[in-house]
Amino acid sequence: MSQPWQLQLYRRSLKKKETMQALLGHLPPVQGRLCLELGCATGLTSHFLRQRGGTWVSCDFERDHVRSARKLVRDRIVQTGETEVPFKTGAFDVVVAINFLEHIENDEPYVREMVRVLKPGGDFLLMAPKGEKGRLGYAVKRRLGFTADQEGFGHARDGYPPAAARALLERNGIRVRGTADYCRFFTEFLEDLLNYAYHRKAMTAKDPTQQDFHGDTAPMSGEALNKVGTAYKVYSALYPALRGWTLLDKLIPFNPGYMMVAWGTKAADAA
């Protein structure tokens, strides 16, 4: 049996591998715990999270993403809305939100919802772009039309600088224990160029009003990947060189990343 398309794409990914490393590197213990994943997209993160143990429920906004995730991991995949988390108060031991909150127009009420379904003392993990204006990577995004004010990536905002993320979580009942960043300039720059190339190709055959939640910047189904089959073969052939380009980030370890992860626990007295 051929490998699922999500895993095929992951094998040739750049930023996704860094995201997965950051996610699994900061994931709290999950064995024997009930865990909620928000922002499962097409199920790639769900696949790896479930390998870590625990019982996972995974959610996303997009119907097509939910359908793809179900094909990959089969069960406990739920389509949600943008205003509430449809579970009982204190239902989960762990809540993980993966590059998800920046898409929510009214983010603070949604944070309260995420905290509500977490048990007191439960573990919380948030991943998001940092969205720091004035940096070279941000200037590249603006040039390519990927900033939030240009409706890039379907974002309601460009992201959360670590201090802003910490403040948002703490005023809603999460005691933040730490933050970290990942994905430095060379990886971010190349990922944006690849997203732009895919976006241009996708939009030539699709009405812009039919764009999906992620703004059509990467394949979000097996059918979408098949439609760019020749281009993907070229990309695969160039992948070793592209991967080598991203390794330049190791030469500038003092340069902070463009993505962030924050983790903490729900206060015992939080609602």
Residues covered by each model-derived region:
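Acceptor-substrate binding/catalytic loop of class I
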Residues: 147-164, 182-184
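Conserved class I S-adenosyl-L-methionine
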Residues: 125-147
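Short N-terminal helix/helix-N-cap motif within the alpha/beta-hydrolase-1
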Residues: 105-109, 136
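A SAM-dependent methyltransferase catalytic signature shared across enzymes that methylate proteins
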Residues: 163-180, 229, 237
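A C-terminal cap/extension of S-adenosyl-L-methionine-dependent methyltransferases
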Residues: 139-145, 181-271
